[in-house]
UniProtKB/Swiss-Prot annotation:
HAMAP family: Acyl_carrier (MF_01217). This is Acyl carrier protein. PANTHER family: ACYL CARRIER PROTEIN (PTHR20863), CARRIER DOMAIN-CONTAINING PROTEIN (PTHR20863:SF76). Transmembrane segments: none annotated. Residues 4-78 form the Carrier domain. The keyword Phosphoprotein applies. The gene is acpP. The keyword S-adenosyl-L-methionine does not apply. Carrier of the growing fatty acid chain in fatty acid biosynthesis. GO terms for molecular function: acyl binding; acyl carrier activity.
Length: 78
């Protein structure tokens, strides 16, 4: 899967889980500050990314993922 395909899927997951418009999402968008996620939203988002991409994201790594681009980069590396 290409990085562009991963980006599109990540954006789609954010739209469905967080109820934001796709045009509100930017690579530098922070889940909490820019997209209005609380800690539970972030946990659910990480779980959905794990399910969608078949990766395990340990808690210590999940804590470091705070922006859209960090999520994309993490998945690309896996």
């Amino acid at each position: 899967m290409s990085e562009a395909e991963i980006k599109d899927k990540v954006y789609d997951i954010i739209v469905s889980k967080m109820g934001v418009n796709k045009d509100q999402i930017k690579p530098e968008s922070k889940f909490s500050d820019d997209l209005g996620a609380d800690s539970l939203d972030t946990v659910e988002l990480i779980m959905e990314l794990e399910n969608e991409f078949g990766v395990q994201i340990p808690d210590e790594d999940a804590e470091k993922i705070s922006t859209v681009q960090q999520a994309i980069d993490y998945i690309v590396k896996k």
